[in-house]
Amino acid sequence: MSHLDEVIARVDAAIEESVIAHMNELLIALSDDAELSREDRYTQQQRLRTAIAHHGRKHKEDMEARHEQLTKGGTIL
């Protein structure tokens, strides 16, 4: 397995796990990875950034839906 394949597997696992802290740690680790080409590093970092952004958007939508449900009738239950 090549180093790039290992990195892709790590990125896949971090995205599947969906833990922002782990994705951020991997983003930082990739920044210092001299074995990857600039293009490969950028591609994997973009995958992580996109997953982080989607996670944040989903969290916001979930919180808004929760607030809406809790405030039916005008007051928080």
UniProtKB/Swiss-Prot annotation:
Residues 59-70 have a biased composition (Basic and acidic residues). The lineage of its organism: Bacteria, Pseudomonadati, Pseudomonadota, Gammaproteobacteria, Enterobacterales. This is Uncharacterized protein YdcY. Residues 54-77 are annotated as: Disordered. It holds the Pfam family DUF2526. One of its GO terms (cellular component) is cytosol.
